[in-house]
Amino acid sequence: MKDINKYRGIIPAFYACYAPDGSISIEGVKALTRHLIAKGVKGVYVGGSSGECIYQHPDERKAVLEAVMSEAKGKITVIAHVACNNTADSVELAAHAEKCGVDAIAAIPPIYFHLPNYAIADYWNAMSAAAPNTEFVIYNIPQLAGTALTMPLLQEMLKNPKVIAVKNSSMPTQDIQLFKDAGIAARGEDGFAVFNGPDEQFVSGRAMGADGGIGGTYAVMPELFIRMNELVEQGNLPAARAIQYKADRIIYKMCEAHGNLYAVQKEILRRMYGLELGGVRAPLPNLIPEDEVVVAEAQRMIEAAVAEL
């Protein structure tokens, strides 16, 4: 029987951290890691969408993970997303992540070409084989990857004993129940986890059986999601929903900017905590002067919501 307790809770998706010249800021990575640990999160999800993984070289992704682990190892759960758009680089990152001592590796399916289930399974299992002592998380995000996790594909992957969880970012919350049922049938009640992916419906996902969440806005307002999670565990859904509504309004506000959502969030963290995380890497759009109004209002909304907890 596997123990999924280390996956239960709030796990922010870790932001890419850049120096002024556009290179990886190792100091920024370490500072953000320390900041999130101090906020009381369960863990971090490194090298995913929020980490701008598809715009980074594998060597950069290795450097980021090493910097995170230098601060986080033994303190919080670390899940490393290792997928690249070719198997060889993905396998290399998986082996590196295991050497770093992460709790789990994760992967989206290959993007662009719509591959058959058996090819996706081969791709994921190749990564898992390169990290044979590390648990594996399937990342389902069909609206961006272009490929959805089907039940036949999940059943095939559950033949791999290292498959411990699904990070589910599809919009229908019923998918959480489908994946959870399949995982429990294969692993037992406490042997398989499902993470809620869409931040805007965290409470809904938890109500449908998600064990916790991995989200791209958690790092800018972890207090709100930690409190939501506590209230769900206490059975106080009305109070959890009230905070969810506040978080959603903040997300909608941040999305009003010309600059990418991650650029907005990193600027808010700079203003609130002095974290120098840089902007975003092209072709993602950076902030423009006109975004000042959105950034300032989103920061105000976060501070007000946290103060009301």
Predicted regions and their residues:
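Active-site beta->alpha loop and helix N-cap motifs at the rims of alpha/beta catalytic domains
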Residues: 2-148
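C-terminal alpha-helical cap/extension of soluble enzyme domains
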Residues: 11-15, 39, 210, 217, ...
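Short, amphipathic alpha-helical "lid/cap" segments that border enzyme active or binding sites
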Residues: 26, 30-33, 151, 291-299
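A general structural signal for well-ordered alpha-helical segments in protein cores
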Residues: 29, 61, 65, 90, ...
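Alpha-helical structural signal in soluble globular domains
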Residues: 39, 63, 67-72, 96, ...
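Short secondary-structure transition/capping segments
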Residues: 56-59, 117-120, 150, 178-179, ...
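Secondary-structure boundary/capping positions in well-ordered alpha/beta enzyme cores
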Residues: 75-76, 134-135, 161-164, 276
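Catalytic alpha/beta core domains of metabolic enzymes, predominantly
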Residues: 130, 142-248, 258
